[in-house]
Regions:
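Compact, glycine-rich, soluble single-domain proteins
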Residues: 18-52, 57, 61-66
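Generic N-terminal initiation segments characterized by hydrophobic and/or small/turn-forming residues
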Residues: 6, 20, 54, 83-86
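Short, Lys/Arg-enriched N-terminal segments with co-localized hydrophobic residues
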Residues: 1-9
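Short amphipathic
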Residues: 10-19
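Solvent-exposed beta-strand sheet faces enriched in polar/charged residues
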Residues: 16, 45, 73-75
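C-terminal structural segments of small proteins and small subunits
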Residues: 61-94
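Broad gene-expression machinery/nucleic-acid interaction feature
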Residues: 12, 39, 69
Length: 94
């Protein structure tokens, strides 16, 4: 995981997938459930596709495999809290 970067209107961080199965139903569900707990907008991008971080099927639609880079972007009033929590979570589940 690269460090959290704070832009003018959002916070972003990147993560390289280490799970042998990539981003799949189980870990996508864990990310989406965690993301739903925050008010800010959360997007995840990989391979030229962008997903709503709060929607499991949207995340699975990224078709991200082991070694792929995920870019997480949070924008809203609780973006810092969301970024900190999600950054720790992805290290454990993806």
């Amino acid at each position: 995981v690269e460090g959290v970067k704070r832009g003018e209107f959002m916070i972003t961080f990147t993560y390289i997938i280490s799970d042998a199965n990539g981003l799949h139903a189980r870990n996508a569900l864990q990310v989406a459930r965690a993301a739903e707990g925050y008010q800010c907008r959360i997007q995840v991008s990989s391979g030229g596709k962008t997903a709503n971080g709060k929607q499991v099927l949207s995340l699975i639609g990224l078709s991200a495999r082991k070694g792929a880079e995920l870019l997480f972007s949070m924008d809203g009033e609780d973006e810092a809290e969301a970024a900190a929590y999600l950054q720790a979570l992805v290290k454990e589940v993806i």
